[in-house]
Swiss-Prot record:
Leader sequence residues: 1-19
Family: Belongs to the serpin family.
Cellular localization per UniProt: Secreted, Extracellular space
GO annotation, cellular component aspect: cytosol; extracellular region; extracellular space; neuromuscular junction; neuronal cell body; platelet alpha granule
Keyword Acetylation: no
Protein name: Glia-derived nexin
An annotated Gene Ontology molecular function: heparin binding
Matches recorded under Gene3D superfamilies: Alpha-1-antitrypsin, domain 1 (2.30.39.10), Antithrombin, subunit I, domain 2 (3.30.497.10), Serpins superfamily (2.10.310.10)
Keywords from the UniProt entry: Developmental protein, Differentiation, Glycoprotein, Heparin-binding, Neurogenesis, Protease inhibitor, Secreted, Serine protease inhibitor, Signal
Site location (Reactive bond): 364-365
Amino acid sequence: MNWHFPFFILTTVTLSSVYSQLNSLSLEELGSDTGIQVFNQIIKSQPHENVVISPHGIASILGMLQLGADGRTKKQLSTVMRYNVNGVGKVLKKINKAIVSKKNKDIVTVANAVFVRNGFKVEVPFAARNKEVFQCEVQSVNFQDPASACDAINFWVKNETRGMIDNLLSPNLIDSALTKLVLVNAVYFKGLWKSRFQPENTKKRTFVAGDGKSYQVPMLAQLSVFRSGSTKTPNGLWYNFIELPYHGESISMLIALPTESSTPLSAIIPHISTKTINSWMNTMVPKRMQLVLPKFTALAQTDLKEPLKALGITEMFEPSKANFAKITRSESLHVSHILQKAKIEVSEDGTKAAVVTTAILIARSSPPWFIVDRPFLFCIRHNPTGAILFLGQVNKP
């Protein structure tokens, strides 16, 4: 089975209630936890939609902005991310190096770029620090021609995500007179399961979507040993979780869904945090079981502006208050858009023909089942650092 996880987050910069958390997380995990909190905000307005984000990508783009911020703008970013401007560089540089390491065996690429208006002068320390931390190059584009600028940026995105994401930026988001910078982060992931699914075990089964409607969708199936467990939310709602490691074993997929089919996925999501996911990793036990998982493709573009404002990052969006003096001292800048687009594809390796509906998981004496036939939560975790590369909910495969 192949998993392709290209991801892109874009911040366009133009002219002119923070939650509490136990201090039990490593610095590497703090950025991902911020992304999970953003995810929780998004889900509030999209409880029945497919949502895919990258917490690590959110941490990266906020880290890039933090390096250019000053005053209260920097303070808000530091408070929500929970490490200072010096810490952000050290931590994210360490995480990125670990994530793209060839030791992982799975393919992970992380790319960053700053696109600036022709003739726009970026402060040398900002450009140098971004290059050191994020391997980020500054590229000039002609924002006076929005269509041309979009083509250049979209081409970069398509190339860095191996063709999986294109047409992200549209000309109407570019102000030909005012747009000065576009910051971009792209993450691409491709992994093979440690325990692979066989195409002959795939058949259509019923999946009950978030809207209550039933759909017949192709379901992957296998009998193997998986680490799994169950726990309950503070208000007593039980849910189950399972780990599917990739063949390099440094990256895993975790799936969680309510134990009772009558419990909506939205009821357990507010309970999810980096600390929660860490507890799953520490309490799961290996069991031989039958796993049934839907094949699916999900594409989602999300505006992160309101979720970030809900967490307390507000000033960088306000023309009269934003302070990005470390990017440039010649003009006043503020963030006009912060967008994220992610695509996830789940497919069997090399399978192009019609699915063979061979049923082999019927025997009454078979091991316990873990059936994912209703809305579920998934995350892709880099285990050595605890970084969450991708996080999403699937309401309809």
